[in-house]
A protein has these predicted regions:
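Catalytic lumenal/periplasmic loop and adjoining terminal transmembrane helix
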Residues: 214, 340-462, 513-516, 521-524, ...
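Transmembrane-helix motifs of polytopic, lipid-linked glycan transferases
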Residues: 17, 84-105, 142-143
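Hydrophobic/aromatic-rich transmembrane helices and adjacent perimembrane loops
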Residues: 127-128, 135, 179, 267, ...
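Membrane-interface transmembrane helices that cradle and orient dolichyl/undecaprenyl
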Residues: 144-162, 331
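Signature aromatic-anchored transmembrane alpha helix within multi-pass, membrane-resident enzymes
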Residues: 12-16, 207, 273, 282-283, ...
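Transmembrane-helix signature of polytopic, membrane-embedded enzymes
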Residues: 97-120, 139, 336-343
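Hydrophobic, aromatic-rich transmembrane alpha-helices
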Residues: 93, 188-190, 264-287
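Membrane-interface alpha helices of multi-pass inner-membrane proteins
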Residues: 50, 114-115, 127, 159-173, ...
């Protein structure tokens, strides 16, 4: 029996780490939203400022923000590590879930199954990775339920007061976890059949919680008064009080949306497992406690929301723990030989459904800026239009994922931008007339080299690299072929890739051939590529078809001989009449132009 228990414990631990690994590996697919940026901004200074800000400038309880401030000081303050903090909290939550399954239902399998079900549940997954209080909300709610059940079993004043401490912790963590306390009270009244002694103990526990929370109580009252004033001023007020701007009304559509989110978009599957568990476990009081956790909490929240503006799905994420336990009980009610198979099918469907719960309208700023950072060069300028100083998420992402020099170069002045050779033209309003006008002013001298992002019916965010020629003044072949410089793109032992920049004032009369040559130190020809302009590498343009004033970028690749010796080589450019071989001369009489020296590895 001890050996079985130890194996179950080790399996539970393994499942916790598997879920944690899955969540950590998924961080790269989660993207910052407005509230997460606020979490960083309000914890940027010292701890006293963090608490002061929540007390006087916001409407939140202080524990999570204080703990996040501490996490940032000692662990790290990147977006990734911010999400790791939430994963750390979920690991502790899942460890408690295992204990609940083992003790409430006398089945380690219930705890193990609940861990895996929660790990694949989109509701738990989404808010378990947010840089907001929700992961810790789930932790303290689970701890409170654990202590509440422990008191119900032992019925001692000590366990009651211990439970009371968790209630105080919940109030300091997030005000709306109080819905769980209401669910606990309902269970006590309708299922536990409390004795007079139990009522005295629970009242004592709640009084202790309020006593501990009382120093913050005036702050909470002030927050409510401030909130009412602000909501009324902006016309967002809904109900007697609450947060009208960030909550939603209790409607049938809102309820269906919550059900869809809680069930990972599979309400039929969850309902089936719920019915199975209900048939086989309805006599167990512990089952009704998790049912109230899973269903009672949202019912209470939605009812209260009809009077006070207190509901949005993220405020009651802790109900997901109850849902996971209800599902685990349902699956373990099946014949033992098919329980693991049923779990695998359930988890697989849930994992498959997770992507469907994410909005396709999310702009993946981090990915876009990281691409820019890889391509950025010294001297680049970031030109943003329109400039929205209030878009804090964008500024946070830019400051953390662009190179420091590029972020410092940020401007919305097109004249200042043109002082640089390379401009990163950034816009979230591509079809705006002013944006189009300024883009078209830049484009003749700064042709687009690369486009990062997209503009589609779901979202629009474009970052376009616009680049001027390397030289401010040309070197002209003959009288018709001004050459504006060279960019050496890559050099390897097998090839050299080069961009040649051309712009003419008038269309040449002839179709010239352009030759890019590679010479060794003795002046011997090693490699050569001849032909018309290969514009952007995909359009052949004869010189007698060039449009005046348009910049042409000739993509050239020199294939090097296999036996080439490593060393320094000279690039050389010629322009000639391909019919006669006669070269165009430069002003100094030279029939060639020396370009860059390159080192062949």
């Amino acid at each position: 029996m001890v050996q079985v228990s130890k194996r179950a414990w080790l399996l539970g631990l393994l499942c916790v780490f598997l879920v944690a690994a899955f969540h950590i590996s998924s961080i790269q697919n989660r993207y910052m939203r407005d509230d997460e940026e606020i979490a960083f901004r309000t914890t940027n200074q010292d701890l006293s400022y963090t608490i002061w800000y929540q007390a006087t400038q916001d409407v939140h309880a202080p524990v999570w923000f204080s703990s996040f401030w501490i996490w940032r000081q000692f662990i790290g303050d990147s977006e990734f590590m911010g999400r790791v903090y939430s994963v750390f909290a979920t690991m502790l939550t899942l460890a408690l879930v295992y204990q609940i399954g083992r003790t409430w239902f006398k089945s380690a399998r219930v705890g193990i199954f609940a861990i895996l079900i929660l790990g694949a549940n989109s509701y738990f997954f989404t808010y378990g990775l947010e840089i907001r209080p929700y992961a810790v909300n789930m932790l303290v709610a689970t701890l409170s339920m654990w202590c509440f059940y422990r008191w119900l079993k032992r019925r001692t004043l000590f366990t009651a007061l211990l439970y009371g401490l968790t209630v105080a912790l919940m109030l300091y963590q997030h005000y709306f976890i109080v819905f769980l306390v209401i669910a606990q009270a309902l269970y006590l009244l309708f299922f536990a059949r409390p004795t007079r002694q139990m009522l005295v103990q629970i009242i004592g526990a709640w009084l202790l919680a309020f006593l501990i929370w009382s120093p913050w109580f005036p702050v909470a009252i002030h927050q409510v008064e401030t909130l009412i004033s602000i909501e009324s001023g902006f016309g967002n007020a809904r109900g007697v009080a609450g947060i009208g701007s960030t909550t939603e009304p209790t409607t049938l559509n809102g309820i269906l949306t919550l059900v869809n989110l809680v069930t990972s978009g599979q309400p039929g599957l969850y309902l089936l497992v719920l019915v199975i568990g209900l048939v086989y476990a309805w006599r167990k009081k512990s089952y009704w406690l998790v049912m109230l956790w899973a269903i009672g909490v949202p019912v209470v929240a939605l009812l209260v929301n009809m009077v006070f503006s207190v509901y949005t799905p993220r405020y009651i994420t802790y109900l997901s723990i109850g849902v996971g336990l209800v599902m685990a009980v349902g699956i373990t009610s099946l014949p033992r030989r098919i329980q693991w198979l049923a779990l695998i099918v359930f988890v697989a469907i849930s994992l498959w459904s997770i992507p469907s719960q994410f909005s396709p309208r999310i702009i993946k700023y981090r990915d876009l800026y990281q691409q820019v950072a890889k391509k950025a060069e010294a001297g680049d300028v970031l030109y943003v239009e329109p400039m929205n100083s209030g878009d804090n998420v964008v500024w946070w992402q830019m400051s953390h994922y662009l190179t420091p020099d590029l972020f410092k170069s940020l401007t919305n002045d097109p004249n200042q931008a043109q002082m640089a050779r390379r401009i990163w033209f950034v816009t979230n309003d591509w079809f705006n007339q002013d944006v189009q006008t300024n883009f078209k002013k830049l484009e003749p001298n700064y042709p687009v080299q690369q486009v990062i992002g997209d503009c589609n019916p779901l979202w629009c965010y474009l970052i376009q690299l616009m680049e001027a020629p390397p030289s401010k003044t040309p070197q002209t072949f003959g009288t018709e072929m001004p050459f504006w410089g060279t960019d050496v793109i890559s050099v390897s032992h097998s090839s050299v890739d080069v961009h040649l920049w051309w712009k003419v004032d008038r269309t040449p009369n002839m179709s010239y051939s352009i030759g890019l040559q590679l010479l060794d130190s003795a002046g011997n020809l090693v490699a050569q590529a001849d032909g018309p302009i290969n514009h952007y590498g995909n359009e052949t343009v004869d010189t007698n078809a060039m449009q005046p004033g348009k910049i042409y970028i000739d993509y050239r690749s020199l294939a090097l001989p296999s036996g080439i010796t490593a060393g320094t080589y000279q690039l050389q450019l010629i322009v000639y009449d391909w019919q006669t071989g006669n070269r165009l001369l430069q002003a100094d009489g030279a029939d060639h132009l020396m370009l860059d020296l390159i080192n062949i590895p």
